[in-house]
Amino acid sequence: MSIITDVYAREVLDSRGNPTLEVEVYTESGAFGRGMVPSGASTGEHEAVELRDGDKSRYGGLGTQKAVDNVNNIIAEAIIGYDVRDQQAIDRAMIALDGTPNKGKLGANAILGVSIAVARAAADYLEIPLYSYLGGFNTKVLPTPMMNIINGGSHSDAPIAFQEFMILPVGAPTFKEALRYGAEIFHALKKILKSRGLETAVGDEGGFAPRFEGTEDGVETILAAIEAAGYVPGKDVFIGFDCASSEFYDKERKVYDYTKFEGEGAAVRTSAEQIDYLEELVNKYPIITIEDGMDENDWDGWKALTERLGKKVQLVGDDFFVTNTDYLARGIQEGAANSILIKVNQIGTLTETFEAIEMAKEAGYTAVVSHRSGETEDSTIADIAVATNAGQIKTGSLSRTDRIAKYNQLLRIEDQLGEVAEYRGLKSFYNLKK
């Protein structure tokens, strides 16, 4: 009764109005699962391949009909007849069917859509929540949210090199309260921006994208919003950055060229100077996490940054690790970073995603489950965060339904878990000496 009888994919739109995949999986019993695939704007060069059509006459070349056809004509034929509960076998079968190291033949977007839909169908068959199916009986930790309330870099037109300025409500007693802290700070920030005559339009991830005078102006404004909402920076709420440094790293000159986003007169820094600058910010402000502070291929820079700040601040590898156990294993071996960002579409299956999270935990690295800038209403990452007890989630600001969908799912999960639910706040940063 749990045997897969049909697999069907269609082209739908993501939060940026670009095509993506939606996949449905059906079983003999009538159990059903649906998965939708996100898409990134700033992507690591080592990520699994997102298959696009390249036909400029249709969606500007971004169509996903090839990936849809690969699901309907190739993957479906291969996995119909499998037990929907055998996630690993199905994921491994798709990886083997693709046969490339980066899923470039069938497309990681095609494979991931099926992987998510299979898990959801299995949970539906067993009549249990997705987080329970994925994580078993020990699922209880609600993640500390990293809320991206200021968008810069490739996520907005704001003249700031850093891609994300985040708040982390670590002092809240529950996830529900953490969400309230964040929402109140978000609205306080909007009032401050309006009072300064700055833009309050939002970027791809729901954060504001005002024309600040620079990074420190952005941080100071966020601190003012935290206080205006009645909270204490460095106690109730900390700050985090996603530098997305690969987006402004000049490979030829081997420098971090802030002029790409901030214009003429902005800084151009060597690796050593980039580390000095990040340390200066950490010493000045209540910063607890920095993502992609160095370029994805600047291994020496990453090791030096970790040596300098790795005991004080969470140093998250996103483009650096691309949710890949090979890169993560090297990072662990060489002492580079102390945390990994987990994006399901960077690697392409739930099985490989869970392997990366497990490897990180075993090495004492934290794992931050993350959205992409091009999202959908699919809330699977909320269930993954709880299923793995990851302790942290990054899923955007306090606006845009594609972001709020994940927060609302976490509220439901917290309610369902009842007294068992744990919100660890600062304790989620077990890689730091605090």
From Swiss-Prot:
The ranges of region (Antigenic epitope) come to: 55-63
What happens after mutating K434L? Decrease in ability to bind plasminogen under denaturing conditions. No effect on ability to bind plasminogen under non-denaturing conditions. Loss of ability to form homooctamers
Q: Which organism is it from?
A: Streptococcus pneumoniae serotype 4 (strain ATCC BAA-334 / TIGR4)
Where, by residue number, is the active site? E205 (proton donor), K343 (proton acceptor)
What stretch of residues is annotated with the motif Plasminogen-binding peptide? 248-256
**Pathway recorded for this protein:** Carbohydrate degradation; glycolysis; pyruvate from D-glyceraldehyde 3-phosphate: step 4/5
Catalysed reactions, as listed in the record? (2R)-2-phosphoglycerate = phosphoenolpyruvate + H2O
| EC number of this enzyme | 4.2.1.11
- Annotated protein name in UniProt: Enolase
Residues that, per the record, bind Mg(2+): D242, E291, D318
What are the record keywords, sorted? Cell adhesion, Cell wall, Cytoplasm, Glycolysis, Lyase, Magnesium, Metal-binding, Secreted, Virulence
Annotated InterPro entries: Enolase, Enolase-like_C_sf, Enolase-like_N, Enolase_C, Enolase_CS, Enolase_N
Q: Name one Pfam family in it.
A: Enolase_C
Provide the cofactor list for this protein: Mg(2+)
Top-rank taxon: Bacteria
Q: Which biological process terms from the Gene Ontology are attached to this UniProt entry?
A: cell adhesion; glycolytic process
Q: What class of enzyme is it?
A: lyase
- Chief place where the protein resides: cytoplasm
- How many and how are cofactors bound here? Binds a second Mg(2+) ion via substrate during catalysis.
The record lists (2R)-2-phosphoglycerate as bound by: Q163, K343, R372, S373, K394
Q: Which family does it belong to?
A: Belongs to the enolase family.
